[in-house]
Amino acid sequence: MASPRSAGGVGGGGGGGGGSGGAAAGDDAIWSKLREAGFDEESLKRRDKAALIAYISRLESEIYQYQHNLGLVLMERKELTSKHEQLRAASESAEIMHKRERAAQQSALAEARKKEENLKKSLGIQKECVANLEKALHDMRGETAETKVSYESKLAEALQLMEAAHKKFDEAEEKLLLAKSLEAESIRTHNAALRSLHDIDDREDQLRRDRISCELENEAKEKEISLQRKSLNDMKKILHEKEEVLLKEQALLNQRDENILERLAYVTHSEKRVEEEKNILEAERKVLLEEKYKLELKMEAIVSREEALIQKESLLDKRESELLILQETIASKERAEIERLNQEQAIALERRKHDFESEMANKQMSFDAAMEVTRNALHQRECALSEQESVVVQRSQNLDLQLAELASKEKALAGRSDELKEEEEKLLLHREAIHNELQKEREEIQRIKSDLEKEKAFFEEEKREAIQAQQDLAITQADRDELLTLQMKLKEEIDSLRAQKRELMADADRLQAEKERFEIEWELIDEKKEELQKEAIRIAEERRAITEYLKNESDIIKQEKDNLRVQFKSNSETLSREHKEFMSKMQQEHASWLSKIQQERQDLKRDIDIQRVELLNSAKARQMEIDSYLREREEEFEQKKAKELEHINSQKEMINTKLEHVAVELQKLKDERKEATLERERREQELSEIKGTIEALNNQREKLQEQRKLLHSDREAITVQIQQLNVLEELKIDSENKQLSLLQHDKSKLGSDINVKDNHHDNSHSSPKQRFGRKLDLSPVSTPISWVRKCAQVIFKRSPEKSASHDQFVQNGVPKKVGDSVDVEDVNLDFAKVGQKRLNHLVSCDQTEVLEPKRKHRRSTIQKVNGGEITSNCLSALEEKCSKNEHDEAPLGLSNTCKEHEYGDKGPENLTKPGEPASSVDVPYVNGIVDNSDSVQEEPSVEATVSATETSNVDGPEDNNDSDEEDEEEEEEKTSSAKKLWRFLIT
């Protein structure tokens, strides 16, 4: 119950300055009545003042806290809305980028399809190579199946990351809803505070009414005081006994307070244990976050390994650019399978991440549920403590009333009032301790809220990182697709894929081991979760025990309150009696008390004014602090916003640079493809030219083979003709030898038959001259010589000058000698000349063979018949050419000349000296004409032999010199023609 002065002060503060005079007059009247009743004004003022100040400060602090929480909630709402808009903008930009990349990919696929159509036209030539490479690819596909599975798992994990990001976004929206609900709760608490203020006003009105009723009762009791003074002496003894009882009760109260403190210590200990368990849960959460970070590091390692593989593939692309066309076709076939594998891998990654995020979400939900349970328990405890505080306040009010009534007693009761003051101070200290504990609990709640905000920010950062990772995965996915299409273009990729297979098998084993370890850890987490559930059950049981204990305590306090009420009633009755006794003393001391009350009233007004000014100043300072704090928070928020915008701009610039780099790389690849196509066209042209040259060479080869066959046939024909000529030559030499022997025999008979000589001379002068000039070419000796000359002229065409000079020489040689021979001696000399020349020629051949064997093989042999030259080296030259073509080392002409030389060696043995008789077999033949003359003189024969020997000795060296010069010229011509023919064959 408030004092009359405190009630008047509160009413004056609420009513304004207009009713201050009436309130002061009412206060004077009330205090005059109280002084008449015997109440102590100073004690009432002090107690009312302290209670009002404490209550006002508590209400102001609660209102300030509610306003502060409301401001924080509004700021959090603004931050969450801004972050939500940023995330939405980022997602829209990511979708736009994804659409652009998809369009670029579709255009690239269209270009690739066009290239495939163009390349299919050239597959006819490369079918055999493609068949071999398809066999290799069949082996390679079996090896790359496991790599494809790994890629599919990675793609699945990436999709799981995206789903987890969407779930986090949904969780953020749920948290926004929670923030809105908290805002609504704060509004409700504000309304409840306003209602409590209205209740306080109503209570003040009730207190005023109670005060009036008390004053009326006091007036009624003042009449009874005179009657009670008589029993005052008896009551003093009773009061002493009651004081002792009160001391005992105070000791009991102290013991109960100690018990309450012990129970509070136990509650704090249990709360500390709950906090320790919370720290353990935080540590486990950190461990899980570290595991998640390790998984992200592993993902980054896999990405770096993929980049290394991409670099290797680029190097292999540079080395194996010659197989670009074929491998592009292979890459187009394998592109669909690689994309499927990548998708399956992303799905596996997303599934794995989704499982991990779901586990984390379950843990967080369990943790949030535990925190909610603890929060509810703390709220219940706060309510219980508030009820206990209200009980204590009521108790303190009752004690204040009791002390106020006891203060009106005599100075003997001053000791008792002092003890009651000490008890009141203890109760105030206890109430302050309870208030401090409540403040600590509020701070813990605020700290938990801040932790939740931090976790919210952490999850939002994770969401941003997931979105960024998704964008990076989209960019790297496009790059990976392009590079994988280039990867299939390599001839040596089989070996690299096998090595990759081994590495991926090792990675698969490692991931299997990690999976098993993760399952083991998951089982451990489940066990820990079960333990935490058991601990939560135990904590709930403890809370139930605490609530039961608090209920019991509240029942005990209610019982004590009832006891105190009973005691208060008894005390009030005793005090009413004592009041009647002390009325006389109070009237006597009324004058002194009135002056003191006025002084104290002035002091109280001054103190109230000072406190009001201090409260206003403190409120202004607090408002300034709040404004400065809000400005600082706004500045920090603006700075964070600017930093985030800068970070977003930098990320956009990085993405633009990466896109430019990708465009440059694509342009380089296009240039390289163009260069490769140009190189391929150039090589095809070169191949066509080479094929044309090969066909031309084959045609020339066939022509040369035909020419060679013709030359072989010509050589065979010529060799046959040479053999025939050799046979004829031998027959000719035999006939000449016989003729020489006949001539010698005829010369021996010329001396005995002169008449026959004259007749024969006449006939030989008339007919042989004409016959020899007319039938020289028809003789059996001259016919094969002319035929050989014709063959030589056809095969080795001479210059017209040499042929003319040769013909002239023949004509000059033969007809002149034929024309000069008039008589039989000249004719016989001519026959002797012919035979002698043949013999001399054979001897000269033997000498030239001995002297110059090499030149003999190179040079043609010359035969002279009647002063004419016959070339017989044409066959040897032709055989030499044929031997050069067929690499023969033994020409046929050489064998024939050797036969002639052998025959020439035998010739001088068959020749008869002058004076020896000739054989009778050779007589009838003289140059193909039958000679029937049997009588030949001896003297002309001697002259003929001498002249024949002389002419042969004189003409022999000259003819040999001329023939050597002509042979050298002809040999030079033939060697030059042979060289030309050989060069033609080589080219």
Curated annotation (Swiss-Prot):
Residues 944-954 have a biased composition (Polar residues). The lineage of its organism: Eukaryota, Viridiplantae, Streptophyta, Embryophyta, Tracheophyta. Residues 403-545, 594-717 form a coiled coil. This is Nuclear matrix constituent protein 1b. One of its GO terms (cellular component) is nuclear matrix. Disruption phenotype: No visible phenotype under normal growth conditions, but mutant plants exhibit hypersensitivity to drought stress. InterPro entries: CRWN. Its main location: nucleus. PANTHER family: PROTEIN CROWDED NUCLEI 4. Architectural component of nuclear structure that plays different roles in controlling nuclear size and morphology. Involved in the modification of chromatin accessibility by interacting with SWI3C, a component of the chromatin-remodeling complex, to thus reduce the suppression effect of the complex. Acts as positive regulator of drought resistance and modulates root growth. Positively regulates the expression of genes related to root growth and drought resistance. Belongs to the CRWN family. It is found in: Nucleus matrix; Nucleus lamina. GO terms for biological process: nucleus organization; positive regulation of response to water deprivation; regulation of root development. Interacts with SWI3C. It comes from Oryza sativa subsp. japonica. Residues 752-764, 898-908 have a biased composition (Basic and acidic residues). Plants overexpressing NMCP1 exhibit enhanced tolerance to drought stress. Residues 956-973 have a biased composition (Acidic residues). Signal peptide: none annotated. Residues 8-24 have a biased composition (Gly residues). It comes from the Eukaryota. Residues 1-25, 752-775, 887-987 are annotated as: Disordered. Keywords: Coiled coil, Growth regulation, Nucleus, Stress response. The gene is NMCP1B.
